[in-house]
């Protein structure tokens, strides 16, 4: 197998007046063999390894092991998967933002650059777990429930507002917008993402890790 499998699988796609680069599984199959029968979820992971292959965190052997999964349907190593994004809800997401803030404080004490402490992947935090229903059955119920929610959790929301401004790749979906499952499916998720890297637009499939057991699985492949 070529030691430059990442480059060997790189292809281009023209969309209107923009050129996108992506990592083609059919091109990779010329070196890896038949991968057509891999589960779709593993194909997404395989593209991820091709895109991030650097010879250290992702090696030829890592890619070959995943491509050959059908031989025994068993993994003999960890998969160095980098998710396209992270989805949090407020119950588990707030402590993570507190940790990031604490890390920045530690870096500041040591004389370092606090702006370097940021999420490596884009993070969306959806505020939905603390919303309660005090009013119902009338036209003003929604607005009144949101107002009470903001009053009861004012300090939390001020902290999250600071986090949204302080950290790059971090956004907050305010209360009253909807639950994580709905917001993820209808607003946040995309089939394909694109990102400018070293002067090139790279297109890649959506993938997601979340902070609870089920939120991220809606409409998922596996």
Model-assigned labels for residue ranges:
Residues 1-222:
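Fe-S-dependent hydro-lyases/dehydratases of central metabolism
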């Amino acid at each position: 197998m070529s030691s430059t499998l990442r480059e060997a699988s790189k292809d281009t796609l023209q969309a209107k007046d923009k050129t996108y680069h992506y990592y083609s599984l059919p091109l990779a199959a010329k070196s890896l063999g038949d991968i057509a029968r891999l589960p779709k979820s593993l194909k997404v992971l395989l593209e991820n390894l091709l895109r991030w292959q650097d010879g250290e965190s992702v090696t030829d052997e890592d890619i070959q092991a995943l491509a050959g999964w059908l031989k025994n349907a068993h993994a003999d190593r960890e998969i160095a998967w980098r998710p396209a994004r992270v989805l949090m809800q407020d119950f588990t997401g707030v402590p993570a933002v507190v940790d990031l803030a604490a890390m920045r404080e530690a870096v500041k004490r040591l004389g370092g650059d606090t702006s370097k402490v940021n999420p490596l992947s884009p993070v969306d935090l959806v505020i939905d777990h603390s919303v309660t229903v005090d009013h119902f059955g009338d036209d003003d119920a929604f607005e009144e429930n949101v107002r009470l929610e903001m009053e009861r959790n004012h300090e939390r929301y001020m902290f999250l507002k600071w986090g949204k401004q302080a950290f790059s790749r971090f956004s907050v979906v305010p209360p009253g917008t909807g639950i994580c499952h709905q917001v993820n499916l209808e607003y946040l998720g995309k089939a394909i993402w694109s990102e400018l890297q070293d002067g090139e637009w790279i297109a890649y499939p959506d993938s997601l890790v979340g902070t609870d057991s089920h939120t991220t699985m809606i409409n998922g492949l596996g």
